[in-house]
Amino acid sequence: SLTELGIGSAIIFALYMPIADNDEEKIASLMRIYKYAYWLIGSVIAVVGVAMIPFLRFVIGDAPQIKENFYIIYGIYLFNTASSYFFTYYSALISAYQRNYVVIGTSYVITTLQSIVQIVLLLCCKSYMPYLIVQTVGTQAYNVIIALKARRDYPYLKRRDAKPLPKEEIRGLFRNV
């Protein structure tokens, strides 16, 4: 995503050496920064998205072909997009450990189930709203499952005492973005 601005790649790159050295404290410190960065991005997306609501009717104009309330559809999309940023650092850590098969496998199962349910709902209901809700539930289910797997496999992520990184190292991270 454009809003990610390469932060994920820079931090995953920064994780490789501490992972190779099994330096859990450094990994926890990097993940703290990663979590903060993504929470900030997700929050900015949510705030800007909510601030845009009064202007949607000017951007969209009249949309007579849409039966459902456009503002509700927009709100669901906004929630789905912004909330995903609050979990993405977990999948990045799993990928940095070169266990991307966990991320891909989980995504495959959730996407397959989601698609089946969405097709059935479209055939039965002929409405976009249930389709969109299932998409959001699928995204949230994926995020929660990946977060639970990461927290189970890497319990040091729960540490509250991870030392902050030195400012020079943080600057180096942002130079790599």
Summary of predicted features, one role per range:
Residues 2-37, 90, 95-102, 162:
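Transmembrane-helix boundary and interhelical linker motifs in polytopic inner-membrane proteins
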Residues 51-54, 63-87, 104-108, 171, ...:
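Alpha-helical transmembrane segments of multi-pass membrane proteins
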Residues 35-62, 116-123:
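Alpha-helical transmembrane segments of multi-pass membrane transport and lipid-handling proteins
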Residues 101, 112-144, 152:
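Membrane-interface helix-loop junctions in multi-pass transport and translocation proteins
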